[in-house]
Amino acid sequence: MADKFNILLLNGPNLNMLGVREPEKYGTLTLAQIAARLDRRAQALGVSLHHIQSNAEHELIAQIHAAFGNTDFILVNPAAFTHTSVALRDALLAVQIPFIEIHLSNVHAREPFRHHSYLSDIAVGVICGLGAEGYEYALQAAVNRLNKS
């Protein structure tokens, strides 16, 4: 059976260090463990999920551009690029693919410089502070939205 929808998951800088990086803020699961959980959930939902993690802004932008015309939804944890990247914002605006912004920690309960996002106002929604489960909620929300369209 062909997958009904194609979803792209982008993970930004330092998320490759999950599991060892500040576990009190980000939890003990590795990105690979989170991805495996999401793959199982995507399979159960009948959608195709493609994962990319990069510490390089230009690589994430290239993936967003490549998604044009073949991706139905984007899930993105921009990590530190949330607060700095007009370029990611512009790439997402250019392709006009709906997306949900995800953060493991509650960015609003952290340092003031983390309170501003260049993506939130153009996102379908934002999930933050719910740990690794936030990815699963975002995936379900994306599928729900796509099924309504």
Curated annotation (Swiss-Prot):
Recorded GO MF terms: 3-dehydroquinate dehydratase activity
Pfam families: DHquinase_II (PF01220)
Biological process, per Gene Ontology: amino acid biosynthetic process; aromatic amino acid family biosynthetic process; chorismate biosynthetic process; quinate catabolic process
Site positions for Transition state stabilizer: R21
InterPro entries in alphabetical order: DHquinase_II (IPR001874), DHquinase_II_CS (IPR018509), DHquinase_II_sf (IPR036441)
Entries under PROSITE patterns matching the protein: DEHYDROQUINASE_II (PS01029)
Residues annotated as catalytic: Y26, H103
Enzyme class: lyase
Positions annotated to bind substrate: N77, H83, D90, L104, S105, R114
Tagged with keyword Amino-acid biosynthesis: yes
Swiss-Prot/TrEMBL catalytic activity: 3-dehydroquinate = 3-dehydroshikimate + H2O
Protein keywords: Amino-acid biosynthesis, Aromatic amino acid biosynthesis, Lyase
Origin superkingdom: Bacteria
Similarity field: Belongs to the type-II 3-dehydroquinase family.
HAMAP family: AroQ
Subunit structure: Homododecamer.
Function: Catalyzes a trans-dehydration via an enolate intermediate.
Protein name per its UniProtKB record: 3-dehydroquinate dehydratase
Organism lineage: Bacteria, Pseudomonadati, Pseudomonadota, Gammaproteobacteria, Enterobacterales
Gene that encodes the chain: aroQ
